[in-house]
A protein has these predicted regions:
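Bacterial signal peptide processing site
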Residues: 25-27
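Secondary-structure boundary elements
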Residues: 58-62, 77-80
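Bacterial N-terminal signal peptides that target proteins for export
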Residues: 2-12
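N-terminal glycine/threonine-rich, aromatic-flanked beta-hairpin/loop signature
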Residues: 69-98
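Calycin-type beta-barrel ligand-binding domains and close structural analogs
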Residues: 30-60, 66, 91-223
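C-terminal motif of bacterial Sec signal peptides marking the signal peptidase cleavage site
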Residues: 21-23
Length: 223
């Protein structure tokens, strides 16, 4: 759920796959794991599905851009996780998303974790703009055409308050030709919304990009 885009301020730069917000990593062919999702991954997938806005935060603090995020379940008959189409845009130009991704929510490596894998869309992603509005989004696209964003999976664990939180692994989400920088995304999500903080770090672990004012706070506006 990454928030960065060349059209937004450096403070918002890096999303993104929350929700919200990851635009980095090596793209290869999609890996499909034929395993029935657990109740944990189903819960995280249900928390992610919906429309979200950080309008209140942006109004109170000009360091944050006013952003809209739409996540829609897709391919609901598949058994290899919860699949969602993700579209992010500035509030002033919702018809021109700056980030479009596919998320695959699956069980993690142990019974208490859930992984959110990131995929890029093939070809010109803008051809899919607005798919979140249709009854059966992405029905003309198949999972084998997706481009995995390796190293940028977010691993989540459940908290005592029933929210889920986690992050990408340090130094693993590395953009091509990065010259020693990596991306770090932290996410906390529940039924009411999510917090996401995308940062770009140099080889010494110092932040060189992304929000310096803390995480973006997105509230659910519709299911």
């Amino acid at each position: 759920m990454h928030l960065n885009a060349h059209r937004i301020l450096p403070a918002a730069a890096m999303l993104t796959a929350v929700l919200l917000g990851v635009g980095c990593g090596t793209e290869t062919s999609a890996r499909i794991d034929p395993a029935l999702p657990s109740m944990n991954s189903r819960e995280v997938g249900s928390f992610m599905a919906g429309n979200f806005s950080n309008a209140a935060q942006a109004k109170d603090n000009p360091a944050f851009e006013d952003i809209r995020v739409h996540l829609r379940p897709i391919w609901v008959d598949r058994i290899d996780g919860q699949w969602l189409y993700v579209e992010q845009s500035l509030a002033t130009s919702e018809d021109k998303p700056y980030r479009q991704r596919i998320y695959q929510v699956v069980d993690g490596n142990d019974a208490d974790s859930v992984d959110c894998r990131m995929y890029a869309l093939p070809g010109d992603a803008l051809q899919y703009a607005g798919e979140w509005k249709v009854e059966r989004p992405m029905r003309k696209l198949t999972a084998d055409l997706l481009l995995p964003i390796s190293g940028c999976t977010i691993t989540l664990r459940k908290n005592e308050d029933s929210s889920w939180s986690g992050s990408t692994q340090p130094n693993e989400c590395v953009p091509p030709a990065s010259s020693g920088v990596s991306s770090m995304t932290s996410l906390k999500i529940d039924h009411d919304g999510f917090e996401v903080w995308d940062r770009t770090l140099n080889a010494e672990g110092q932040q060189v990009g992304g929000s310096t004012a803390g995480p973006y706070l997105f509230k659910r506006t519709a299911n």
